[in-house]
Design a protein with these regions (language model features):
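The feature marks helicase ATPase cores and/or their adjacent C-terminal helical subdomains
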Residues: 1-502
Length: 502
C-alpha cells in the first residue's frame, strides 16, 4: 500500500510530532510505516516504545511491522508503565518492602478509594489495582511519582528509548497525559502522538480529549492533519465532516444523495423498512448503544428475511487481571480453527520465545485443556497448569467465565465476527472496524454533549457506501434531529442538503 503525500510527510518528519487523523485516513498504516523507517535509520543502541490501548491493537502493530521488533516495546499503556517504571523502580522510592512480584487486578472487588490504600495493597498482596472512581488512574499516578523521584528510573528511560509512539491519544486520561508529557518535555524523549478528538468514545471512563488538543498547540510539536477518508463515499464524508468545526471546510456539495437513507418510521415497521435499502450481498452492521438493543435488533432484522448475527460481549471480556490475555488466547485456540500454539506465544505480553521446547509444552497443555471440555474440574486443572507454566495466576471465578465462553456456542461468534455477512454490535465494539453498510438509530445520539457527538462520528464513519439512520418518534430521536440541524446550520447547510429524509 503506497503512501499519500500527507502520509509521506508524516513518515519523513523528524522530532516531536502530533497527527490529527480523521476516521478512515490510514492512521495505523502511516504509524507503522514511520516506526519501520525510524527503526531502520537508528544507529544507536536505543529502542522505541509503541504504545496503544489494547492488546489487540498492539498485536496489529506487531503483525504489520516488517522490521525486527524483538528489542523494542510494543504494548499497552498500562503494561509500559508497569514493566518499565513501576516493577523495576518502585523499591527505589518506597523501599525494599516493594521489591516483590506484582500482578494486576482491576476488578470491582480489588478497587480502592485512595492512593495510600492502593500502595498498601501492593505491599500486602502484591496487587496493582485501580480506584473506585474510574476517572482517576492509580497506575499512572504511581508511575509519575516513581519517575519524578527515582534518578535511576529517569536515567534508564533516557538511555533506553530514542522515541515513543502513542496511538489513540484522545482516549488518554489526565494522568496518562501528564506522564507522557514528562517523558517528552523533561526527559527529552522524542514523542509521536496520533489521535482524533472526534473519536473520543471513552470520556465516561476518564478519557480527556482536551489533552490531545493541548499538544496541538505546544511549540515543541510539529502538527499534521490527515483528513482524506479513504473508507467512506463522498456523501458519508460530507455528513461526518460537517459534525466538527475542524473538518467543516472539507464539505463539498454533491448532487447524488443516495448513500445516506434517513428513515422516519415506527418501532414495529423499522426492520422491514431498513431492509429495503440494504444489499444482502454486501456486508452490513447494525450499531447500537446497548447490547440489548443490538441483540433485539438482530432478531427483528432476521425475522424480516436477512440473517443478522448478534455479536455478544463474552464472559471473559470482563476479566481485568494480567492473566486476561491468556484466557482469551485459550478460548481462541479452542474456538478458532487456525489459531495455534504459535499464535498464543505471539500474544504473550513479554516477547514470546518460540523455542521448540516451549512450543511443544504449550501444544501438549492446550491438547489437555481441549480433552477436558466435558469435565469442568479437569478443565480448570488443565488451564491452571498452563497458566502456572507461563508464570500467571488464575482465579476460580475467571476459570468459570472461560469455561462458559468456550462451552456456550452463542459466544463463539465474538471471536470471528468477520466471518458473518450481517452483524449487530455496539458501536463501542465497532471501533477500528468497517462495513459496506451501517444502520444506526437516531435515539442513541442526542448530540447534546461531546461524548454523544464523538459516539455518532465513530458510528457513521464505519460505513463505506451506505448509511441508514433510523428515526423513531421519541424524545431522544427528536433531540438528535434538532441538534443535527443546528450543527449543520453552522456551515450554512440544512439536513436536506446532505441527505434525503424518507
Amino acid at each position: 500500500m503506497n503512501l499519500s503525500p500527507i502520509q509521506e510527510e508524516i513518515v519523513n518528519t523528524s522530532g516531536n510530532l502530533i497527527v490529527r487523523a480523521s476516521a478512515g485516513t490510514g492512521k495505523t498504516h502511516t504509524m507503522v510505516s514511520k516506526i519501520s523507517k525510524e527503526i531502520n535509520e537508528n544507529r544507536t543502541h536505543k529502542v522505541v516504545a509503541a504504545i496503544t490501548f489494547t492488546i489487540k491493537a498492539a498485536q496489529e502493530i506487531k503483525d504489520r511491522l516488517s522490521v525486527d521488533v524483538t528489542r523494542h516495546f510494543i504494548g499497552t499503556n498500562n503494561s509500559f508503565v508497569i514493566e518499565e517504571i513501576i516493577k523495576p523502580f518502585m523499591k527505589d522510592v518506597y523501599g525494599s518492602d516493594y521489591d516483590l512480584d506484582m500482578s494486576t487486578d482491576y476488578s470491582k472487588e480489588a478497587k480502592v478509594d485512595t492512593f495510600q490504600a492502593a500502595i498498601e495493597k501492593i505491599k500486602t498482596e502484591g496487587i496493582l489495582c485501580s480506584y473506585t472512581d474510574n476517572k482517576k488512574n492509580f497506575i499512572f499516578e504511581l508511575a509519575q511519582e516513581i519517575v519524578e523521584k527515582s534518578v535511576a528510573c529517569r536515567l534508564f528511560l533516557k538511555a533506553k528509548y530514542f522515541k515513543i509512539y502513542i496511538d489513540e491519544y484522545q482516549d488518554c486520561d489526565k494522568s496518562m497525559h501528564k506522564l507522557f508529557m514528562y517523558l517528552c518535555d523533561t526527559l527529552k524523549i522524542e514523542t509521536f502522538v496520533v489521535g482524533d478528538e472526534k473519536q473520543s468514545i471513552y470520556i465516561w471512563r476518564g478519557a480527556y480529549p482536551e489533552a490531545f488538543v493541548s499538544i496541538w498547540h505546544k511549540e515543541n510539536f510539529t502538527t499534521k492533519f490527515m483528513g482524506d477518508n479513504f473508507r467512506s463515499c463522498k456523501q458519508i464524508q460530507n455528513y461526518s465532516n460537517l459534525l466538527y468545526e475542524e473538518t467543516r471546510s472539507l464539505y463539498s456539495p454533491i448532487k447524488e444523495l443516495n448513500n445516506i437513507v434517513w428513515l422516519s418510521t415506527t418501532t414495529t415497521a423499522w426492520s422491514s423498512e431498513v431492509l429495503k435499502y440494504i444489499d444482502p450481498n454486501k456486508k452490513s452492521a447494525l450499531l447500537r448503544f446497548s447490547n440489548d438493543n443490538a441483540r433485539l435488533g438482530a432478531g427483528e432484522l432476521s425475522l424480516n428475511g436477512v440473517n443478522y448475527t448478534y455479536i455478544p460481549q463474552t464472559p471473559i471480556a470482563e476479566i481485568t487481571t494480567d492473566t486476561a490475555w491468556l484466557y482469551s488466547a485459550i478460548a481462541k485456540c479452542l474456538i478458532i480453527e487456525k489459531y495455534s500454539a504459535y499464535d498464543l506465544i505471539s500474544e504473550i505480553p513479554v516477547e514470546g520465545n518460540e523455542t521448540r521446547k516451549l512450543v511443544s509444552a504449550i501444544k501438549r497443555m492446550l491438547k489437555k485443556i481441549e480433552q477436558s471440555i466435558d469435565d469442568e474440574d479437569g478443565f480448570y486443572s488443565a488451564t491452571n497448569a498452563l497458566a502456572t507454566y507461563l508464570g500467571y495466576a488464575t482465579k476460580g471465578e475467571h476459570l468459570k467465565k472461560l469455561f462458559e465462553t468456550i462451552t456456550d456456542e452463542k459466544y463463539h461468534v465474538a471471536f470471528e465476527p468477520e466471518k458473518y455477512q450481517h452483524i449487530a454490535i455496539t458501536f463501542h465494539s465497532s471501533k477500528g472496524l468497517e462495513f459496506e453498510q451501517v444502520i444506526v438509530f437516531a435515539e442513541d445520539y442526542r448530540l447534546s454533549d461531546v461524548s454523544s457527538l464523538c459516539n455518532h462520528y465513530v458510528a457513521v464513519t464505519r460505513a463505506k457506501s451506505k448509511l441508514v439512520i433510523v428515526k423513531l418518534s421519541n424524545y431522544n430521536a427528536n433531540c438528535f434531529q434538532a441538534n443535527l440541524a443546528k450543527i449543520f446550520a453552522k456551515s450554512g447547510v440544512s439536513i436536506n442538503d446532505v441527505l434525503i429524509q424518507r
